[in-house]
């Protein structure tokens, strides 16, 4: 935050964890959502956000960083403006915290403008819709739940089923294939995952620190003196914003808005198609729950804040496409205890164009990505938007998988021999379809040892059509697992046949 000349001085009267009560002159009481600033000699200034007016001169604020070391009577300044973040081409390739301070070890970006993180959504007459499909290169997503350009996609799953890996693969695939600008907001997730993401983006060329830095990184170093700022600002296609799980609830509740503000800048002033990745929207809700409890509000269902729906709406309504450009968002949603009826994921559902449900059952079978094709949905899955071939192939895939699921109990009790020839054929093809829905990821190469695959939509449709038409019934099932195109499956199947 920049230090303004119109700041009003006050003093701290109470500190309770991340909550700070402050007193100001009667004619200088800050507004709700205004930023407060506390100077700290040994580190960066502490930024807080006003949440409540307690009386004539007192306000209650939530801190965006640790309040360790604060004392009653200590000076505090009202900035008379909301929290703001730097915007401009200079923020490409950079990492920021919730208040726009760089956390990548590099100097502050030299920008001419900052923008408040609290903004109104675009007016109704500025909005625009799209029937264009955004190709992701991930077979199961492109076929079963195509992503609309400018739409919102939710990735639902419990702990450890692959939400963050899927987000990282989407960043890698879409940034490379479409060369669009991306903004990533890490909300309440592991710091290690943030570090992994940064390294992955540099290795993939989505973030560019220059050739000298890349060479030092490949040799095991991390020499920031070798960063080429001109190349970073012109060639990098992503900006990262983090408010991780070790940070106070204020930071986790606002870092999504920080990332969204940057995405809105690229959309409105750059006239670009922007990708906005949010990992994890549940942590945003969880932070709001903590803040609500700290403010003394009465909880609602399952202990969530009474303002859950309106807070979610404030965030989601800003993620939209205008006549200037589009924001396509991918939001990871942690599902507590794998319960999709929990208020947090249930409230998120209402705002989404696509829902991608990750299945623990598929994960345990080793089918990755573990996306459930029967639970996942898309508003784009219609013949008018996709064309006849794509639509019919997707419906046939869902139909055969549904039939396989219906026969599971019979198979478990009586075995395959009791099925009719027609059902046996359906089961065999469904198992091949299920395995062909898997594919190796670029971001998981170091774990799987298999090179990642980007599969165009046309190849995806061709492959599934061949399986459904029975052209590949002679190939063993394991030939279909973790392959890219159908040609790779045929090649692997022929090799297996020769070995046998």
UniProtKB/Swiss-Prot annotation:
Membrane topology note: Peripheral membrane protein
One Pfam short name: ATP-synt_ab_N
Chain's gene name: atpD
Complex formation: F-type ATPases have 2 components, CF(1) - the catalytic core - and CF(0) - the membrane proton channel. CF(1) has five subunits: alpha(3), beta(3), gamma(1), delta(1), epsilon(1). CF(0) has three main subunits: a(1), b(2) and c(9-12). The alpha and beta chains form an alternating ring which encloses part of the gamma chain. CF(1) is attached to CF(0) by a central stalk formed by the gamma and epsilon chains, while a peripheral stalk is formed by the delta and b chains.
Keyword Ion transport: yes
Record keywords, A-Z: ATP synthesis, ATP-binding, Cell inner membrane, Cell membrane, CF(1), Hydrogen ion transport, Ion transport, Membrane, Nucleotide-binding, Translocase, Transport
GO annotation, cellular component aspect: plasma membrane; proton-transporting ATP synthase complex
Family that this chain belongs to: Belongs to the ATPase alpha/beta chains family.
Function (record text): Produces ATP from ADP in the presence of a proton gradient across the membrane. The catalytic sites are hosted primarily by the beta subunits.
Binding site for ATP: 157-164
Record keyword Membrane present: yes
Catalysed transformations (reactions): ATP + H2O + 4 H(+)(in) = ADP + phosphate + 5 H(+)(out)
Compartments, record wording: Cell inner membrane
InterPro entries linked to this entry: AAA+_ATPase, ATP-synt_VA_C, ATP_synth_F1_bsu, ATPase_a/bsu_AS, ATPase_alpha/beta_chains, ATPase_F1/V1/A1_a/bsu_N, ATPase_F1/V1/A1_a/bsu_N_sf, ATPase_F1/V1/A1_a/bsu_nucl-bd
EC nos: 7.1.2.2
GO molecular function: ATP binding; ATP hydrolysis activity; proton-transporting ATP synthase activity, rotational mechanism
Matching Gene3D superfamilies: 2.40.10.170, Bovine Mitochondrial F1-atpase, Atp Synthase Beta Chain, Chain D, domain 3, P-loop containing nucleotide triphosphate hydrolases
UniProt protein name: ATP synthase subunit beta
């Amino acid at each position: 935050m920049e230090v303004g000349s119109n700041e009003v001085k006050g003093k701290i009267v109470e500190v309770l964890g991340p909550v700070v009560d402050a007193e100001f002159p009667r004619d200088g009481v800050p507004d709700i959502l205004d930023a407060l600033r506390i100077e700290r000699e040994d580190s960066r200034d502490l930024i807080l956000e006003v949440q409540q007016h307690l009386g004539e001169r007192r306000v209650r604020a939530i801190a965006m960083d640790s309040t360790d070391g604060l004392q009653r009577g200590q000076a505090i300044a009202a900035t008379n403006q909301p929290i703001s973040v730097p915007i401009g081409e200079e923020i490409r390739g950079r990492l920021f915290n919730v208040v726009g301070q760089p956390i990548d070890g590099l100097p502050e970006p030299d920008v001419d403008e900052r923008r408040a993180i609290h903004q109104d959504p675009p007016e109704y007459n500025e909005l625009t819709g799209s029937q264009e499909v955004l190709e992701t290169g991930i077979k199961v997503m492109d076929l079963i739940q195509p992503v609309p350009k400018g739409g919102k996609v939710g990735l639902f799953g419990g702990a450890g089923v692959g939400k963050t890996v899927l987000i990282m693969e989407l960043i890698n695939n879409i940034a490379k294939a479409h060369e669009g600008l991306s903004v990533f907001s890490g909300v309440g997730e592991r710091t290690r995952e943030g570090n992994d993401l940064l390294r992955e983006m540099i290795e993939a060329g989505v973030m560019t620190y220059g050739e000298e830095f890349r060479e030092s990184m490949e040799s095991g170093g991390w020499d920031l003196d070798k960063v080429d700022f001109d190349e970073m600002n012109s060639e990098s296609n992503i900006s990262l914003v983090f408010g991780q799980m070790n940070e106070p609830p204020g930071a986790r509740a606002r870092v999504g808005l920080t990332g969204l503000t940057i995405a809105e800048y690229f959309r409105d002033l750059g006239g670009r198609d922007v990708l906005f990745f949010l990992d994890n929207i549940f942590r945003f809700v969880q932070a709001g729950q903590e803040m609500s409890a700290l403010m003394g509000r009465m909880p609602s269902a399952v202990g969530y804040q009474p303002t859950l729906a309106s807070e979610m709406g404030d965030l989601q309504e800003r993620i939209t496409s205008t006549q200037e450009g589009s924001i396509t968002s991918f939001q990871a949603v942690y599902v507590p205890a794998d319960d999709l009826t929990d208020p947090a994921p249930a409230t998120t559902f209402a705002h989404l164009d696509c829902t991608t449900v990750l299945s623990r059952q598929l994960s345990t079978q080793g089918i990755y990505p573990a996306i459930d094709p029967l639970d996942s949905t898309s508003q784009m899955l219609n013949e008018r938007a996709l064309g006849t071939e794509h639509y019919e192939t997707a419906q046939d895939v869902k139909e055969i998988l549904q039939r396989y699921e219906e026969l599971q109990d019979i198979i478990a009790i009586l075995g395959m021999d009791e099925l009719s020839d027609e059902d046996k054929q359906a089961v065999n093809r469904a198992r091949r379809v299920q395995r062909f829905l898997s594919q190796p990821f670029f971001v998981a190469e170091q774990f799987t040892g298999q090179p990642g695959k980007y599969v165009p939509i046309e190849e995806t449709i061709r492959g599934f059509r061949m399986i459904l038409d029975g052209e590949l019934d002679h190939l063993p099932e394991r030939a279909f697992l973790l392959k890219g195109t159908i040609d790779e499956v045929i090649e692997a199947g022929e090799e297996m046949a020769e070995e046998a």
